[in-house]
């Protein structure tokens, strides 16, 4: 995956086809904490009675993952990276209404193969 506006290649793989890692800069992390809030919890409770997808939580989860990913990419750029490999996501419940979403990977400099 490439983020042209950030000029950073991003992948869950250890390598990027067509590129060689020329320098490993270190681990980069992006974190966000989201609160479901009273309204979200109420809507989820009502939807859980009838079953099905809880769209409010899906949207919140997608936004949180993207924000964590963007923050991780920003950290990589601060180190001078032009790629991040081995990206992973993790999440933790901090309390009944707050979740922590983490994106992490290895910031690297890559060069395009000739």
From Swiss-Prot:
Question: What top-level branch of life does the organism fall under?
Answer: Archaea
Gene3D superfamilies recorded for this chain? Hypothetical protein apc22750. Chain B
Similarity comment: Belongs to the UPF0145 family.
Q: Which PANTHER family match?
A: UPF0145 PROTEIN SCO3412, UPF0145 PROTEIN YBJQ
- The name under which this protein is listed is UPF0145 protein YG5714_0873
- Say which species the protein is native to: Saccharolobus islandicus (strain Y.G.57.14 / Yellowstone #1) (Sulfolobus islandicus)
Q: What is the lineage of its organism?
A: Archaea, Thermoproteota, Thermoprotei, Sulfolobales, Sulfolobaceae
């Amino acid at each position: 995956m490439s983020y042209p506006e950030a000029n950073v290649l991003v992948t869950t793989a250890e390598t990027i086809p067509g590129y060689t890692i020329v320098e490993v800069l270190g681990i980069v992390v992006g974190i966000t904490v989201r609160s479901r809030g009273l309204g979200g919890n109420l809507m989820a409770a009502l939807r859980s009675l009838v079953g099905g997808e809880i769209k409010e939580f899906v949207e919140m989860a997608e936004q949180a993952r993207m924000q964590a990913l963007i923050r991780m990419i920003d950290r990589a750029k601060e180190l001078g990276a032009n790629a991040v490999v081995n990206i992973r996501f993790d999440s933790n419940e901090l309390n009944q209404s707050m979740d922590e979403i983490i994106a992490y990977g290895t910031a690297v400099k890559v060069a395009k193969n000739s």
